[in-house]
Amino acid sequence: MWNDEDNNPYGTSFDRRDSQSSSINPTSPSTREYQRFEPPQTPTSDSDNEHNHGVIHDDSDDDDEDLTQDAGPKRKPGGYDSRIEQILYENPKLSILITDAGKSIESGGRYIVYTIKTGDLEVRRRYSEFASLRDALTRLHPTLIVPPIPEKHTMADYAANPTNAKQDQQIIDLRKRMLAVFLNRCRRMEEIRTDGVWWRFFDPNASWSEVLHSHPVASIPKSILKAPPLNPANPTPAHNYLPIPAASAKLKTVAGTNHDNSSGHIQAGPHAFGRFPPEGHNLGEQELDPYFISYESSIKDLEQLLTGPMEKVNRRTLSHLSSLAADLCELGSVYNAFAVSEQAPSLGPAIERIGQAADLSYIATEELSGSLGASFAEPMREHAQFAGVVRSVLKYRVLKRVQQDLTTEELSKKRALLDQLEQSEAEARRIENYLSSSQQISPPPKRSTSLREPPSHQRRDGSQEDTESIDSDFPGTHGDFSSHTPSASQGLPERSTSVPSHKKMPSGNSITNKIFGPIRHAVQGVVDVDPERTRRDLIGKTRESIGQLEQAQVVSEKDVKEASASVLKDMKRFQKDKEDDLRRYMLAYAQSQIEWAKKSKQQWEEARAEVEKIDES
């Protein structure tokens, strides 16, 4: 059986490799020169693997190392921020290894940690930290097809093993292999390899929590659509004005492109016509849409194939091989017991040799089951996850296109509204000018007011004379006798008694005010008391919105072009890697079958030779 970390089906060779032989150690801490990584051949048993955990050298490696030291490693201009950055920058082809997976000693064994070895540095990370790394890379590079990580525990896992689901050794070994594949896939992507967040994940002196809560991860907007696609951590002020489309938004169907959208089933191959737009052609976004739609359709078909028939066949095959191995193990023990009970000098050894062949076939079948699972079944499940990643990247590009259309539509609406408001304002000014000119021609008469004034004075004088005559008939008996003529205010006692009744009126209307006050306020809010001022304020706000949308339109157009170019570039890279991977998987499948058949054939040929020695007499 291979070591867990050796079950990496994505290496550059199908031969088994030692988990530690690919690590590099500096020749001296002062020079910081590194040996060129050259994966050696790995023995076929675990016991042999345990003796090869050091750095393996051969003559060719020494010669290449001398050449490397003469030329010197590629150094970064401006220096390095940390040791791990230097290792990753100067050794871009260095494999990242996960050497161990087990319970954390620091946490008292509450969770599983994975030991990552990069050169001569080691760091321990949890599965949740791997998930946060991938999430950060996805947000920092929304146009890149970031490799997936193994899935979390499903409800079926907890139902089957409710107490020890997280400590299931098979799941831990699977994650150990696939997380190493994830790290090495990311390492081969230049945009990620040069990202500071990426190499800080391998820095034992860096706090991963602080990395996630600092720039650039913390500077990414809550909605990735309000950020530039190539630099989401540094959005411009104009990005704040971009509208956010719904997650289910789709592109508008343009007449004349339907025939392109339905050309999904295209020939396979890196140079197949129609998979990608031709080189050297400057196509518009609407002309690029059919290529993206066709690629998404082909990826969806591949996902259905991998998660449907292929997954079922792989599960049945591995199950049958495991059952066959168990039967061969039992058969070997039966033959061995039978050989002990047989007293014939030639028959006993032959039966024993049959039992040994069955035992060795059991071991070979177990190895076949493990190698097929690691080199074929697991990669197929990973590619099914890749299909979902590709769809999400293409969906991001679609949402950027929809965002551009929404910005253009909103800008057109605001401009139409501004034209309407300006026309209304011009009409209102025309009417106002007409009314003001009419008032200057015919001023209103003022004679009627002057005619009404004398009667009021006469009434006031007459009322005063009547009051004085009444007071003379009824002289006062109290007060100051020196004053025989009381004032007019003293002759009106009834009016003073009517004041309290008037003071009670507001208290009687307070209930009405409480009931109808909010209604009156709402009606006044609906019925504009100053339509001219409201119209002018609305014109100002509309002009401001138009200015913001014009800025948003410029950045949206730029974002769509950058997103389409970056997505298309990474799609080509992914397509090439996918075809290389599928070719490697098929060869690995055939190689595993060949090795199993050779071992089985050799054991049973030796058993047949022993059986032919049986004395027939």
From Swiss-Prot:
Gene Ontology CC terms: cytosol; endosome membrane; phagophore assembly site membrane
Cellular compartment(s): Endosome membrane; Preautophagosomal structure membrane
Compositional bias ranges of the Low complexity kind: 20-31
Membrane topology: Peripheral membrane protein
Domain of life: Eukaryota
PANTHER family for this protein: SORTING NEXIN-41
Protein's UniProt name: Autophagy-related protein 20
Gene source species: Gibberella zeae (strain ATCC MYA-4620 / CBS 123657 / FGSC 9075 / NRRL 31084 / PH-1)
Gene: ATG20
